[in-house]
């Protein structure tokens, strides 16, 4: 959803398959709002996916992307990077963040959070994105959001409210859950929103082949 529910969103997202049974979910928030921010965030995702498909390790791909943003232009532009890499064979997920909002993992009886204190891509030349690995099980849901989602909720209660929304719904379809969360945030928070808002949800299920 774009700022004011009308403008073009500066957020971009993508889900794609990588060799070796890996699946990526990437969410990027470009600086500011509107078309320029959208181009910036879309470019970050496109380049990261190309580097990963070419076989570069994720840390190397992020470093190259950051260098391109820092050195490639005179005007200051930066984008957050929130990436989840799912190993479809082991159930492990690597969460890599640069300036991104928390990720919420919905378990059977609790919500876990993945945080980042790393700066966004394009701010400093030497950047090491933060990485956390978690083992996921069937039924888990991974909820990724841009900061506009949290900023729309009452100050000091953002994460608590989102926890309650995620935990309190029986919705298991990722697409439906993403739409539900956006709708509830608009109901409970600032409407129209003062920043772009994006929710990206991935569900984990065991599939047995006979």
Model-derived regions, located:
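Juxtacatalytic helix/coil linker segments
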Residues: 1-27, 32-33
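Short beta-strand-to-coil "C-cap" segments at the C-terminal boundary of structured domains/repeats
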Residues: 202-208
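Acidic loop->beta-strand submotif enriched in PP2C/PPM serine/threonine phosphatases
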Residues: 7-19, 79-81, 113-156, 190-194
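Catalytic core of PPM/PP2C metal-dependent serine/threonine phosphatase domains
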Residues: 38-108, 186-195
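Active-site-proximal, acidic helix/loop segment immediately C-terminal to a metal-coordinating Asp/Glu
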Residues: 33-54, 136, 140-192, 208-209
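DG-centered beta-turn motif at the end of beta-strands
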Residues: 29, 100, 145-148, 196
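PP2C/PPM family metal-dependent serine/threonine protein phosphatase catalytic domain
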Residues: 1-12, 62, 66-72, 101-133, ...
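Short hydrophobic-aromatic micro-motifs
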Residues: 23-26, 95-96, 142-145
């Amino acid at each position: 959803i774009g700022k004011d529910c009308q403008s073009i969103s500066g957020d971009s997202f993508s889900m794609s398959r990588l060799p070796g049974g890996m699946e990526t979910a990437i969410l990027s928030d470009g600086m500011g709002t509107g078309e320029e921010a959208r181009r910036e965030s879309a470019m970050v995702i496109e380049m990261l996916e190309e580097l990963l498909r070419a076989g570069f390790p994720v840390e190397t791909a992020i470093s190259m992307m950051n260098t391109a943003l820092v050195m490639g232009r005179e005007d200051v532009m930066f984008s957050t990077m929130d990436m989840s890499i799912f190993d479809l064979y082991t159930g492990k997920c690597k969460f890599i963040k640069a300036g991104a909002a928390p990720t919420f993992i919905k378990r059977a009886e609790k919500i876990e959070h993945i945080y980042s204190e790393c700066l966004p891509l394009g701010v400093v030349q030497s950047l090491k994105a933060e990485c956390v690995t978690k083992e996921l099980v069937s039924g888990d849901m991974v909820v990724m959001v841009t900061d506009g989602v949290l900023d729309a909720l009452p100050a000091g209660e953002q994460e608590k409210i989102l926890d309650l929304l995620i935990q309190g719904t029986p919705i298991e379809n990722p697409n439906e859950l993403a739409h539900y969360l956006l709708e509830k945030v608009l109901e409970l928070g600032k409407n129209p929103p003062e920043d772009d808002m994006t929710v990206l949800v991935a569900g984990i299920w065991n599939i047995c082949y006979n």
